[in-house]
């Protein structure tokens, strides 16, 4: 799809590699080539009973994208102070923060987003946050309701509220 439409794409998935499973994020350039594969480093993504084949990645890194130095932190990765310090050492221009959270629209839009903005403010770069959205279960309270934001210096610079369909276009 990236190549067909000449469009860069970044997406999360459960990766299987050599008998191990990882919570991963892959980024493709407009030509459809893999330009990054990041594996979540924090342990919170798996069920407590998961076996040793469910693993975390080995660390953070950056990759070039559209003239910027990009780093990725998946879901819970940015809630560990040691991870914040490691990301800041990399000195990225932008950090992508894709997550899966199941806050209600009002929980996210009224309170939780402020906590995320504060946490993102510990990173010395703008943070692009995006939550998954589940369109097939509108009555289910325990599913991702979407939402996206540009966090910078502890503030919300731009946002697409949870529960709203749309596109958030930002420059950073």
List where the protein language model places each region.
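CN hydrolase (nitrilase-like) catalytic-core segments centered on the catalytic cysteine
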Residues: 1-10, 79-167
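A cross-domain feature marking catalytic cores of carbohydrate-active enzymes
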Residues: 13, 74, 131
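Active-site catalytic loop in hydrolytic enzyme cores
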Residues: 16-90, 104-114, 118, 171-172
């Amino acid at each position: 799809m990236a190549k067909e439409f000449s469009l860069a794409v970044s997406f999360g998935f459960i990766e299987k590699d050599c008998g191990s499973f990882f919570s991963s994020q892959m980024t493709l350039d407009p030509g459809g080539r893999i330009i990054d594969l990041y594996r979540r480093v924090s342990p919170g993504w798996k069920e407590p009973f998961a076996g040793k084949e469910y693993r975390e990645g080995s660390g953070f890194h950056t990759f070039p994208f559209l003239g910027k130095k990009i780093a990725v932190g998946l879901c819970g990765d940015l809630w560990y102070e040691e991870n914040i310090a490691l990301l800041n050492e990399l000195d990225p221009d932008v950090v992508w923060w894709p997550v899966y959270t199941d806050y209600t629209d009002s929980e996210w839009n009224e309170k939780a987003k402020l906590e995320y903005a504060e946490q993102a403010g510990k990173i010395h770069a703008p943070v692009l946050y995006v939550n998954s959205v589940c369109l097939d279960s509108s009555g289910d309270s325990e599913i991702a309701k979407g939402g996206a934001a540009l966090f910078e210096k502890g503030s919300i610079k731009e946002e697409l509220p949870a529960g709203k369909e749309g596109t958030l276009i930002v420059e950073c």
